[in-house]
């Protein structure tokens, strides 16, 4: 069955049509990424949603596999540069497209940065972007690659697909947060949910929620230090966005039980948010008939694409992608 016939029925299909801006003059991308805009023109009027994305594609080569990158919390499409450049060098028939996630620091609507009204908007954006990539490369296999928060979005979007109608051919989850740490008191999680119901648009900083807690993200950088160097960093987020992330984390193990495509899970042994046992518990819930691969890097941290072990990690990703290419 053609992939275009296998899309799951998000409202996005009825509401959005995909247009490319005049930036498509840069369509044939070489070894350097180009920022191109996607226009989600909504039927029935209203301002269209426009988001940027970056492409790593070997010039003159038609890919037989395309990776779609969904970046993490306070991240950006450029976070995929290290992986994209690795693939350009070692897998010329693999292209990587990474888009700017709604409500994050590169959202063109400034008032929307640090906020999300409904997580279905994230899923709709991913599905619409996937359709754009499929229209451009109709014969290529599609792999979703979510990092951290992006892993939450990709997993839940896939979970919403009807059985037998998966919108991608495989899933890479890099540093997914699959459960809350045991040292996080349940009442704190419940308090955020209640506060988000009462004051959904109130904004708070992460420092206000977790004072004096600066998480190590790579061997060389902690969260505060790393975020301050990013032009796309957001200082404060709405309570409803934080509550949404809490619900997505809480639902990850349920999503695992409904997994319907091959999955690769990447985890750093020094990741602050989850440990090896958490990952193994998540993977154990994936149905027996689904191909699942788990890679644990004992000395790595949360941001694996920036980690000192990234070349080893990228080689493992490349081996897994080649298996999907042969499926």
Descriptions of predicted regions:
Residues 88-110:
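Conserved alpha/beta-hydrolase
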Residues 299-327:
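Catalytic active-site module of serine/aspartate enzymes centered on a nucleophile-bearing elbow/loop
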Residues 73-85:
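The serine-hydrolase catalytic nucleophile loop
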Residues 259, 265-267:
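Short beta-strand/loop motif that positions the catalytic acidic residue
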Residues 32-58:
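N-terminal cap/lid segment of alpha/beta-hydrolase-fold proteins
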Residues 149-238:
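Alpha/beta-hydrolase-fold enzymes
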Residues 74-77, 105-133, 137:
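Catalytic nucleophile-loop/oxyanion-hole region of alpha/beta-hydrolase
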Residues 272-278:
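Conserved alpha/beta-hydrolase "acid-adjacent" motif
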């Amino acid at each position: 069955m053609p992939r275009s016939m296998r899309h799951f029925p998000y409202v996005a299909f009825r509401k959005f049509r995909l247009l490319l801006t005049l930036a498509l003059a840069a369509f044939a991308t070489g070894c350097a990424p180009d920022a191109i805009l996607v226009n989600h023109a909504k039927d029935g009027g209203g301002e269209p949603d426009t988001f940027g994305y970056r492409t790593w594609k070997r010039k003159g080569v038609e890919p037989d596999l395309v990776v779609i990158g969904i970046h993490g919390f306070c991240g950006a499409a450029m976070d995929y540069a290290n992986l994209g450049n690795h693939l350009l060098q070692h897998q010329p028939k693999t292209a990587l497209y990474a888009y700017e996630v709604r409500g994050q620091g590169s959202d063109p609507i400034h008032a929307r940065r640090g906020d999300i009204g409904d997580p279905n908007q994230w899923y709709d954006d991913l599905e619409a972007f996937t359709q754009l990539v499929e229209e451009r490369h109709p014969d290529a296999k599609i792999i979703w690659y979510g990092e951290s928060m992006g892993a939450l979005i990709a997993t839940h979007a896939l979970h919403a697909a009807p059985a037998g109608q998966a919108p991608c051919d495989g899933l890479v989850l890099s540093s997914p947060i699959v459960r809350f740490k045991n040292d996080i008191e349940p009442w704190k999680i419940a308090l955020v949910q209640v506060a988000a119901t009462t004051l959904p648009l109130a904004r708070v900083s992460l420092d206000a929620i977790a004072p004096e807690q600066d998480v190590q993200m790579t061997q060389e950088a902690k969260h505060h230090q790393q975020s301050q160097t990013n032009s796309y960093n957001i200082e404060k987020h709405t309570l409803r966005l934080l509550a949404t992330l809490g619900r997505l984390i809480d639902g990850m193990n349920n999503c695992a039980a409904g997994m319907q495509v091959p999955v690769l899970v990447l985890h750093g042994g020094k990741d602050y948010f989850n440990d090896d046992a958490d990952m193994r518990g998540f993977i154990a819930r994936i149905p027996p008939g689904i191909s699942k691969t788990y890679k644990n890097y004992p000395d790595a941290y949360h941001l694996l694409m920036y980690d000192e072990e990234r070349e080893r990690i990228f080689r493992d990703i490349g081996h897994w992608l080649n298996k999907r290419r042969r499926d």
